[in-house]
């Protein structure tokens, strides 16, 4: 007990609280969008919005190859203002350019992609329009994320909190005018979400770039832009990008596509918003804390891990205690009509996300210590053995998908991945954290 207490005392709980507040903002405006969609007649709007989930996986692959390594490269250049300015300018060009090319490709091939992903023919036209709008918003979104990383790198952390709160405020205003059922709303439906994202991301990006310019990082000078640093950038980003590719492609084919096949994309999308937005909020923000703490000090892995496990256990107990509140929340806050179906789906996944919560400690330690090769190992093992086996079973007719069956498949896959992650974590501890003297005694 004393060991746990000491471990908790060494954790930056104030930063964890700040991260929780920061993470709460996007959760609130995502929930607001779900609420407004619930005011529209029928369930088709959820199904259309649900199609964006697999499109976002494509963007996530590129994002994890670009955004994750940025913290290292931007931070390493902070002592040299000219070098930092060059990386900021060229980084904006490269990331914006890559996202623009990707978005153009998605815009051109949206309908064939929707057909490949087995979307219902009734919503393909409307889904294609919405995805194209969101593709434009994603270009502004990556520029916003890049600019936020730059603010963190120059020590303007408090401004990041300010802009996160501003994003929430802007989203509430734009969603109210574009999506809501209020008399003065334009009633653009699901497309209003995309237009709202374009407006908010663009405005915030411009404001942050103005702040960076005022700080002297985006001023015009005669110095020629150098893209040489991008070689190392892509070298490091390729590992996290490859890991994300393996993980997300498997999810797209074995979960997102299968959910479309059984016609459950709408309820599955709302369930994911509830789980990832509310249940996993403290887990994911704890992960951000773990990344920050172990990246600066290797010994934090040894001193803080008991505390991380204690916090995670408390979060999981909180999930169980608040189960009676789930249905009222789904009905009155998410404004979802078929509450029983949504609750049933969430409860199927519930136990498996407890395993994910603990796996989060392992994976974020790997990210923080720069051991993304362990993450790649996990993805390859889980997706080739587990999901590969299910794919063969599906193709041979041994497994016939249903919404509950897909949820169980994904849930057990999450548990399988957590076990693989735990094995990799144990290997990491033995290799890097246990002194040689202790290893020789144990052997």
Could you say what each language-model-derived stretch is?
Residues 169-205, 340, 384-422, 427-433:
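Membrane-interface helix-loop junctions in multi-pass transport and translocation proteins
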Residues 40-43, 153-154, 187, 262, ...:
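Helix-loop interface residues and adjacent transmembrane-helix termini in multi-pass membrane transporters
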Residues 108, 121-147, 275-278, 337-362, ...:
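Alpha-helical transmembrane segments of multi-pass membrane proteins
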Residues 82, 150-177, 191-194, 198, ...:
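Alpha-helical transmembrane segments of multi-pass membrane transporters/permeases
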Residues 1-17, 188-197, 206-248, 429-443:
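Interhelical loop/hinge segments that connect adjacent transmembrane helices in multipass membrane
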Residues 101-129, 317-344:
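Short membrane-interface helical motifs at transmembrane helix boundaries
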Residues 47-104, 144-153, 268-324, 359-367, ...:
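Small-residue-rich hydrophobic transmembrane alpha-helices
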